[in-house]
Amino acid sequence: MWPPKHAHIGWLSSLALVVLLMSLQMVMVSGIECYVCDTSDTEHPFQCGEWFERYDIPDIQPQNCSSVHGAQFCVKHVGRFEGGIGAKRFCSSKDMGNYCDYVRNKGDRMDYRSCIYTCDTDGCNAAGRLELEWGVAAALLTLTWLLRH
């Protein structure tokens, strides 16, 4: 008779462990969900601007990033793409950082601001980081106050 009586608890513990590991694997496979869009998309050209319209409730929904090997991050890239200024949102396996820079491509007569925002929670690449903007505002208010006193 299987399992033997003395191995009953060990057998149930092993079965429980296998079920637990399988359920954890399923959670890990689901991965991060990010907004994935591009302003150069001709079917829906206005769904992927720098800011989502309609009070930040976008027409698109975050997508599962399981098709990107090792995806752990969502990225929002704002800059000049294919002749126009716009945004791209995508899944990434690399932390690309958070920074802005001025870029001049070959043939350009001026510099264009290009920004990268990287985050690691579901749907976090909807907008840029507000902390940076609030920090700049606080610094300007402090400077204004100091100059007046």
Curated annotation (Swiss-Prot):
Glycans are attached at residue 64. It is found in: Cell membrane; Cell junction, Septate junction; Cytoplasm, Cell cortex; Secreted. Its main location: membrane. Pfam families: QVR. Residues 32-126 are extracellular. A lipid is attached at residue 125 (GPI-anchor amidated asparagine). GPI-anchored. Keywords: Cell junction, Cell membrane, Cytoplasm, Disulfide bond, Glycoprotein, GPI-anchor, Lipoprotein, Membrane, Secreted, Signal, Transmembrane, Transmembrane helix. Disulfide bonds join 34-74, 37-48, 65-91, 100-115, 119-124. The chain crosses the membrane at residues 127-147. The keyword Secreted applies. Residues 1-31 form the signal peptide. The keyword Transmembrane helix applies. Residues 148-149 are cytoplasmic. InterPro entries: QVR-like, Sleep_regulator. The C-terminal transmembrane domain, directly involved in membrane association or indirectly through facilitating GPI-anchorage, is required for autonomous activity in cells expressing bou/boudin and non-autonomous activity on remote tissues. This region is required for exit from the endoplasmic reticulum. This is UPAR/Ly6 domain-containing protein bou. The gene is bou.
